[in-house]
From Swiss-Prot:
Protein name (database record): F protein
GO MF terms held by the record: structural molecule activity
Region (Disordered): 1-23
Extra remark: This protein is very unstable.
Upper lineage: Viruses, Riboviria, Orthornavirae, Kitrinoviricota, Flasuviricetes
Signal peptide: none
Length: 162
């Protein structure tokens, strides 16, 4: 009989890949953007605008908020189409940073001066999840805000527009 211990299998450390981490952050950003707009009154639509980010990333593609062409009766407004490189969809705000319910009937509703024009795109959050009674379930994701880049952080419940 040998006194040598049996060889054991090496345990490999399983760390999330870069793609996995990126994918997770995209989902978090999308949820936060859509949730903020739903709270502001655009139940199944997301109030968004195009924006160039310092990183040069195209968040319109990254966060799956791609605009869709819709007929005038199918939704609040027409989509301007696909965004170019370094452009992003971002929650757009009125003077207080909230989506403007009055703009629901307008395509490219004007926002605050210098902010640009907003469009309305279909949200992927179910209507039930956007209702006031379910807001508490989304508030639990608040710690994710610290992980997001500056422009995506919320100030007093609304998106910063700077």
């Amino acid at each position: 009989m040998s006194t040598n211990p049996k060889p054991q299998k090496k345990k490999t450390n399983v760390t999330p890949t870069v793609a996995h981490r990126t994918s997770s952050s995209r989902v978090a950003v999308r949820s936060l953007v859509e949730f903020t707009c739903c709270r502001a009154g655009a139940l199944d639509w997301v109030c968004a605008r195009r924006e160039r980010l310092p990183s040069g990333r195209n968040l319109e593609v990254d966060v799956s908020l791609s605009p869709r062409l819709v007929g005038p009766r199918a939704g609040p407004g027409l989509s301007p189409g696909t965004l170019g490189p370094s452009m992003a969809m971002r929650a757009a705000g009125g003077r207080d940073g909230s989506c403007l319910p009055v703009a629901l009937g307008l395509a490219g509703a004007p926002q605050t001066p210098g902010v640009g024009r907003a469009i309305w795109v279909r949200s992927s959050i179910p209507l039930r999840a956007a209702s006031p009674t379910s807001w508490g379930t989304y508030r639990s994701s608040a710690p994710l805000l610290e992980a997001l880049p500056g422009p995506w952080r919320m100030a007093s419940g609304f998106w910063k527009t700077a």
